[in-house]
Amino acid sequence: IVEKRRIAKAEGEDKKFAEADAPMTLRNAALTDELGIGPGEVRVQRFVSLRDPRGEVPFPIQHEDTRERLLTGADFDIESLVAAPDGTFWIGEEFGPYVLHVARNGVVLDAPIALPGVRSPQSPDLAPGETPTLPASKGFEAMTGSPDGRYLYPVLEGALSADADQRRRVVHELDTRTQRYTGRTW
């Protein structure tokens, strides 16, 4: 479970649904009936906070000036998670859109991996005056991985702004060894 609190601004205002002071956490949870302790509840067994103490994220974050550099909903909009065979996690998010690589303790291992040529209005990589190529909140929504962990397949929630078919949802292939997109899409 990826936890992030969501808020919405007043009707008609721009909506950025991630709260700036809400730390992002990964939680390992189980249903109580699966644990043999009764039905109808979810029990959190373990959780870790996502953080960047090594400074891998190359742009300013909400807690830029703290030692732990906890990540919040203002930094990334996490939507998908793939557990890698080595115990690390790959996370798809919407703002960049980016794929993040984090250790099992929540520490960011590498710089966020941007999809080349694609930027949302919320992307920290969007230069002043640059036109976004992806509508807001249409970044990586779903993601899966190959059984051996070599490739990830993040899926854009929406079509690129210039795509004539706005129903199109593109699956991209990311090589986890090189941390580069292969150019293969579906």
Residue ranges, per PLM feature:
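Sequence/structural signature of beta-propeller domains
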Residues: 1-186
